[in-house]
């Protein structure tokens, strides 16, 4: 997995978690 893709996945999970938390 490329670093950029890893960052995108982590960021996506982060955003999804924040949306669900809110």
Curated annotation (Swiss-Prot):
EC identifiers of the protein: 1.15.1.1
One GO cellular component term noted in the UniProt record for this chain: cytoplasm
Distribution of this protein across tissues and organs: Dominant isozyme in roots.
Catalyzed reactions: 2 superoxide + 2 H(+) = H2O2 + O2
Keywords annotated in UniProt: Antioxidant, Copper, Cytoplasm, Metal-binding, Oxidoreductase, Zinc
Coiled coil: none
Primary residence: cytoplasm
Cofactor stoichiometry and binding remark: Binds 1 copper ion per subunit. Binds 1 zinc ion per subunit.
GO MF term (any one): metal ion binding
Subcellular location field: Cytoplasm
Cofactor list: Cu cation; Zn(2+)
Cited function: Destroys radicals which are normally produced within the cells and which are toxic to biological systems.
Subunit structure: Homodimer.
Similarity comment text for this entry: Belongs to the Cu-Zn superoxide dismutase family.
Protein name: Superoxide dismutase [Cu-Zn] 2
Organism for this UniProt entry: Picea abies (Norway spruce)
Upper classification of the organism: Eukaryota, Viridiplantae, Streptophyta, Embryophyta, Tracheophyta
């Amino acid at each position: 997995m490329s670093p950029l893709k890893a960052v995108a996945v982590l960021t996506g999970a982060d955003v999804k978690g924040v949306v669900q938390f809110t």
